[in-house]
Amino acid sequence: MSTPNPSADLLERLFKLSENKTSFRTEVLAGVTTFLTMCYIIIVNPLILSETGMDHGAVFVATCLAVAIGCLVMGLIANYPIALAPGMGLNAYFTYSVCLGMGVPWQTALAAVFISGLIFLAISFLKIREAIVNAIPMSLKFAIGGGIGLFLALVALKNSGIIVANPATLVGLGDIKQPTVLLSLLGFLMIVVMHHFRIRGAIIISILVITAISTFMGLNQFKGVVGEIPSLAPTFLQMDFEGLFTASLIGVIFVFFLVDLFDSTGTLVGVSHRAGLLVDGKLPRLKKALFADSTAIVAGAALGTSSTTPYIESASGVAAGGRTGLTAVVVACLFLACLFLAPLAQSVPGFATAPALLFVGVLMIQGITNIDWEDITEAVPAFLTIVFMPFAYSIADGIAMGFISYALIKLLTGKAKTVPYMVWIVAVLWAFKFAVFGG
């Protein structure tokens, strides 16, 4: 007669390992795999957000804690093998469009993220979420993802020095002979090759290798690997709600909300499909999964980071056998352990993380192949959405142009009845904003 194992019984009750045909060992391996593919965020996110004036160490801690909170809620309440972290694209929008582009203080931008999280939390328990998602044309959904990909690419090329400002042509090619530029190109090639051969952790490996090479060449100062946990005080509860509800910042809140809505829904369904967790094409416990996402957004903003969202890198853990929330809990524990790695994160230069941004841009733009380019009434709004994001240096303006042009072109071509009501509402609101308040 076997001796009862209280720990095993607890894990079975919490995560239903047997029912999901998995084991403790498999779930831990899946969690480690997911962690390796997404841990680059603890380096990239503080670098991006610190450009707004936010304290690097505090953002590092906020990033680790936001990931841990999101993953714990996802694992323990929703029981899905899906990890969450500050979204790439949303952090770039926060820094380069909202704070640096619009001149919004980072404290106010955090308040916008917080409000968007509360809105997301509210609709997580209502049926309007599906109505909103389904009301947005597929061409615009894919175009938004592709446009953000190009926006990230432009940021990456700028940060690496590959693209520089040029008074005559707006932008131009930088000095390719510069060591930092060459190292960025090397880092990008490393990621591409490792990704091709399905080497887990390709992005973080590239970042660490380029950091090591640059330190050896004297281009960067190495500050160590392990150290004390930085203070969270500089960003904790520093949200400033005064002046938040202006026309321009309401648009910012809308963009944070809309992009995360698409991101979370698409990732949750996509990863769950790969794991075989969908029932009749739908995701059981969807409300609990969205609750985890919105909780992470609200908590992250309070701690001091931009919007948190489910990570597509979770698919790597699913491929390794992850089927339950135990995978997400393992990811949470590993990110908490990373709190002691602040010196390493502070040692990484911007040109070492630029390849990661560029590669994420590659992944995000792949969805534009699903746009119906033969239908000009679908193609033009999608195209405008994509190109306005990098050229106007604003994700919000890209979304605005997409919605306005979609409604207008459908109206002028006699297809007004095919336009979802949500598109009309958003298009009119953006048009009013531009007409009254300008860009």
Each language-model region and where it sits:
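Loop-to-helix transition at the N-terminal end of transmembrane alpha-helices
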Residues: 53-72
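Membrane-embedded alpha-helical modules
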Residues: 102-216, 220, 329-439
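Helix-loop-helix junctions within the multi-pass membrane cores of secondary transporters/permeases
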Residues: 7-45, 66, 87-145, 273-368
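Helix-loop-helix hairpins and the membrane-proximal interhelical loops
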Residues: 2-58, 171-173, 204-287, 430-432
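Hydrophobic/aromatic residues within the transmembrane alpha-helices of Major Facilitator Superfamily
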Residues: 32-39, 69-72, 76, 157, ...
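Membrane-interface helix caps of multi-pass small-molecule transporters
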Residues: 47, 72, 76, 97, ...
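Residue-level signature of catalytic and energy-coupling elements of molecular machines
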Residues: 28, 48, 132, 201, ...
